[in-house]
Amino acid sequence: LNQDDMIAARPRTPIRVCLLGATGTIGRATLATLMRRGHDVVCFARSCLGGALAVDGPEIRVVDVRNPVSIARDGFRGERFDAVVSCMASRTGTPRDAWAIDHQAHVNVLAAASRLGVGHFVLLSAICVQKPLLGFQHAKLAFETALVESGLMFSIVRPTAFFKSLSGQVERVKRGKSFLVFGDGALTACKPISDDDLADYLADCLEDDRRWNRVLPIGGPGEAITPRQQGEALFALLGRKPRFRRVPLALLDSVIGTLSAAACLAPPLSEKAELARIGRYYATESMLVLNPETGRYDAAATPSAGTETLFEFYKRLVDGDAAPERGDHAVF
């Protein structure tokens, strides 16, 4: 047995976990994994979303994570917790939302956890923070820094790409339309990871001391894949000849420029401009480990975990065995 197998095989000691972001797709998968492993899980959730949790068993506490008083009074309640696991993230990625949730809400929870002597904080971050050009990336990095400097044991997990973020074109291709790519479809690559595989990785952080006090980039199994390869695989599953439509990056640049200029007169458009900038980032930057010496993305240096591949997920979507759930962060 290798060390991973030995860790998986050894008896687990149940611990008490505060779970943030349990109503998102990754959060729900993480909740199910933690419950399956026998941990005592308490979810901090907004009142309007608490009923979305499909897993029986966890205690759900209605907490406003933007309010330190609510976190202490309604959340932790002065009780003992062994760990905090956060899958919480801003819904849109716009600066105001990101600094409120990705940074300040986490700072609030960290402060309360520190006062109560919580021993471990597992944070779901994102691999894109290694090259921060956007507001939400700076917000995430600011909290990463606060966590590292807090003195709490930490595990900062930076996944590559989620299956849901790469599934936005499945339905359009099933309807007979072409697959959209930026440039030639090979500008970027990623090693996407499934919800369940990432949930296992997050839960393992509680038990595997090799993941303590570390920043952990992680992708899914297999080779890195480009958008064009994603399209080719999808057409193959449908038994059709590949059809691609190229979207010039200049189009995104034009949209960004127009919205940015218009935002001077209509400030609400600034958020739309930021969303366009986010789209351009994902269209031009690979979700892989960035080599600081060469400035290049390195698929070989990007660790892998799990068993499910994106193309297996595509097959489930095509066969109707899974439903796409893209959320707010899908490019298409």
Question: Residue locations for each model-derived region?
Answer:
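N-terminal Rossmann NAD(P)H-binding glycine-rich loop of SDR-like oxidoreductase domains
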Residues: 15-39
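Non-catalytic, hydrophobic alpha-helical segments
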Residues: 26, 84, 198, 202, ...
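NAD(P)H-binding glycine-rich loop region in Rossmannoid oxidoreductase-like domains
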Residues: 49-115, 128-130
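Glycine-/Pro-rich loop/turn segments that contact NAD(P) or position catalytic residues
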Residues: 90-176
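Glycine/proline-rich active-site loop of Rossmann-fold NAD(P)-dependent oxidoreductases
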Residues: 165-172, 205-216, 240-242
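Glycine-rich Rossmann NAD(P)(H)-binding loop
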Residues: 182-188, 214-224, 238-239, 247-249, ...
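Substrate-positioning beta->alpha
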Residues: 185-206, 214, 226
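A hydrophobic C-terminal alpha-helical subdomain
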Residues: 250-332
